[in-house]
Amino acid sequence: MAVYSVATGALAPVLSKLSALLGDEHLDLAERTRSDAMFIRSQLEAVHSLLLPRISWGMTGEEVDALCKDELMAEVRELSYDMDDAIDEFFLEEPMAGGDGGPFDELKTRVEDVSKRFSDSRRWRPPVEQHQPSLTAATVDCPPPHARFVHNMMDVSELVEMDKQHEKELIKLLEQGADTSIYASRWRIATPWHDKEQSTVVKVPEREWGFPDNRNSPFIWASDSFERLRSGSLCGDTLRLDGEGANIRKLLSTLRNKVGRAQLVQVEDKRKRVEEATKPCEFHEVKTICILGLPGAGKTTLAKLLYSHHSTTEQQFQHRAFVSLSPGANLTDTLTDILLQVGAYNDDATPYCGTGTPHQQYLIDNISAYLIGKKYLIIIDDVWHWEEWEVIRKSIPKNDLGSRIIMTTRLNSIAEKCRNDDMDAFVYETEALDYVDAWLLCDKVARKSVTCMNINPCYDIVDMCYGMPLALIRVSSALAEEIQALDSDERQIWRALRRVEDGILDIPSLKPLAESLCLGYDHLPLYLRTLLLCCSVYHWLDGGIVQRGRLVTRWIAEGFVSEEKAAEGYFDELVGRGWMKHRGLNEYEIHPMMLAILRYKSKEYNFVTCLGTGSDTCTSASLSYSSPTMAIRRLCLQRGYPMKCFSSMDVSHTRSLVILGDVIGVPLDMFKRLRVLDLEDNIGIEDSHLKKICEQLESLRLLKYLGLKGTRITKLPQEIQKLKQLEILYVRSTGIEELPWEIGELKQLRTLDVRNTRISELPSQIGELKHLRTLDVSNMWNISELPSQIGELKHLQTLDVRNTSVRELPSQIGELKHLRTLDVRNTGVRELPWQAGQISGSLHVHTDDSDEGMRLPEGVCEDLIKGIPKAELAKCSEVLSINIVDRLGSPPIGIFKVIGLHKSIPKLIKDHFNVLSSLDIRRYNKLEEDDHEFLANNMPNLQMLVLRFEAPQREPIIINRTGFQMLERFLVESRVPRITFQEGAMPKLKHLEFKFYAGPPSKDPIGITHLKSLQKVVFRCSKWYKSDNPGIKAAIDVVKKEARQHPNRPISLLITEGDKEVPNIEAHGSSENIVVVHAAPDDAISCSSCGRTSTSIQEGTVRDRIPAMDLFWPEFNSYEKAKRN
């Protein structure tokens, strides 16, 4: 599916729609219209063919940026959007313009003009391949610019003082190493500068409080901004709060939302500064340190400080090198840089005698050979690509001489991979400065610009810079004097800050900061730029908070991504690149300075127009958006923007309207081509507003997305049926109590989200939504069942019923052939209809917190169902289901379960279900011979079998070499496991499991030595009859004895009691020195120096790790050997 782009606008979708218009479905198209459409398509295809190679074939970040800003390219985008509007309106048979001419007459002329200008322009001709300049031998005699880095360091004195704590911590890592044996301990967030407990003083004009009858309101509002609010006082206009873990930014944002004005007066620490306490550890020394942080957070500064720290102590490191990379770095130059700085070119053993460009492998081999026996410090600054780092890493040999490698990066994905792939790596994450430190730094810089400060401008600047040192320094020096001159004119102060936000690249003093931030933006591929620019609607006053689900869905509605799975992947990619940081649940945050870059870029490309707090309304209203080449395509309104300005604005071409905050009175009738209307969390929206929205058919006939989450609506009006093109409807977290039957009229609906509402049942008309892909009814305890019509949703991919009162699902669920995700967590659903086996190949069922979900067993297909007589088909649901939740939790794969207690296998199962891949059956008594024969030889696909016996077994079940040829998992539940395996039995069995209660002791052999493929034996004991019961203990002893003789040593033994694993784990690898290992949660390996501990077997992974570990006691106590095995 063609998608929209920040560079080409709607060009690709328009070409796709024109092809559809000229297809067989529109054979009755008027001749003139068909002729115009063919002409326009041919002209636009020519333009697209010139653009596509440049976009697809390795354009640099700067070239893509120039492409987006190009005047002719801007005309192409605007033309494509107008063309897109015209085609959509034509499909609806409601063209906007009347007259005798064709619907595309005006656009035809514009298309012809733009196409001609494109073809005549030299700029858009196919690019000529350029070769990298060669590196001559003379390069070796003249060190490149990076080699002179140490002698040309920029003055970082402003940051040095603020980073002393981080410097001390990293120096200890360099000199002493740290514990890398524990996976989690190899990622440390920078030590905080202050302890948690603080006293915060906020000043708000008394007239603004507005709560004479309730003086507790400010304390209630403030409580969410503290981990623990201990006390507070309100005296006049001064609010004093004492507590732990204060989030100052959130506190000020909350108070400003409630009362309009709030200024921080003072923050006092009530405890001493936290002392750094890193001690050397006896496990491993850190070989590699990865410093992770946002641009401007001080990564490079820390690296420079470390490099300088050792500049006078040459005996510590024999050789040093500091190399800075860029997104498009030349690796050959980088390796040459390292070679020169460490002095390898002076070594007689590795002379360079070639001419031209040295081969990378030559450089790698020579650097490695030179450093192999030496103590070195290598710093690689600003790593962008993991592949580049791997090449550099190959040239730097590891040794035991105390050498260190330091890399800095802004990409979370690289830091994660560094820790995962290198056991000797340590990730050191530099966090933003806390509010107090940020204020101190800002105040220090501001006082250099303003000698006498009547008011302190730092509070607003600190809010905006959010702890980024470089931003604090640059913005403080740029704005302190201006804000001081404005005295207490709050509106003008906001405008000054807004100028930084909207024009960060235009202010000379902010250029170093802007360039650093733009590096990350220029590094993004085009599709990620498009998606990221959608975030420019968010504002730093609201914390830059991004709701993941809201943003992803809007991407899809806007046409930037076609599939939800792809959109989720792109979101994760942006997180991995450091643009967003996970905050909690579904919330992420973007740093205000990054938002400023996005705002600027968005304005440059005319991508999103943002109007709201701090805007100059006169300027905003008079922008040349009425120009035919610069229409408002996407509009975001934020609190504080006056509605009267709409009278001078043309929003008839606006495709998307996002409203953040309580903005009401928007004249929606002025929006003629709206596709996206996002009103989420706007508490000013009530039932009357929604009804009016639905009645404005003229304005909203193209509407695809309607977001009403968190509004005050209590019902969906009947007029909702007028939104015929609606594809996404979000009404979650509202007060609606029912879905009207008119919901069935929304034939194009793809996503329906009604979670966390008061709805008690779904109407049968839900089955008319033939294009529905996502249905979310979670968090609604009033819902107890789903209608059978749900089986008519043939394209449904996601069904979420978690946290509801649903206990069973309709059998029609098996007809949902495209269902991919079924979430039944925290419901009464324990089994699925057997018909669900039809979708076993694609469906993942979520019954617990596992991300992967459970797969369903195979065996049921459409042909099987057709072969069952109708008279018997209904009875099948009485004897067969799919078990997804066992008393012991969720199995890794569902299993077909014979419902009830039986004396023999039901006839229906034998007649129609011999093709099943699994079976779970509960019997009164022993397994009769004919049933044994059926299971062993008449179920050729059987891979998992569960036999449960109510009565004690007097004689053992004999399993011989015939039958069960495909069985891999076998579970027997009885009082005692009376079963014997003969030679050659169950040749593919890997997992054998017993669940028993109590019975007389027996030393009869079980015969597990005959199970040639066996890997694991599990004993599950009832919580009433534990493993020390004589009968159970005797059976376990028999298995232990046979395990010693099994050719597949080691065989893993796992014992559980009740619903939990017990600390009895034994892996049998020989007949000598067999002991039971007690791996209790408290048992851990402890470092005598630092006291850190490491559990030998991590919780949740014991099942996977046991088979690969030989856990004899001497080895168990050695972390190193356990890790190697």
Swiss-Prot record:
GO molecular function annotation:
ADP binding; ATP binding
Recite the UniProt keywords alphabetically.
ATP-binding, Coiled coil, Leucine-rich repeat, Nucleotide-binding, Plant defense, Repeat
Species lineage, top-down?
A: Eukaryota, Viridiplantae, Streptophyta, Embryophyta, Tracheophyta
The protein here is known as Disease resistance protein PIK5-NP
Paired cysteines (S-S): none
The family line of this record is: Belongs to the disease resistance NB-LRR family.
Q: Which regions form coiled coils? A: none
Q: Which GO terms describe its biological process?
A: defense response; response to other organism
SUPFAM superfamilies recorded: P-loop containing nucleoside triphosphate hydrolases, RNI-like
Region Structured coiled coil (CC) domain, annotated ranges: 1-273
SMART domains, alphabetized: LRR_TYP
Sequence ranges assigned to domain NB-ARC in this UniProt record: 282-564
What ranges cover the LRR repeats? 651-673, 676-700, 701-723, 725-746, 747-769, 771-793, 794-816, 818-841, 873-898, 939-966, 989-1013
Pfam entry (one): NB-ARC
Gene this protein is translated from: PIK5-NP
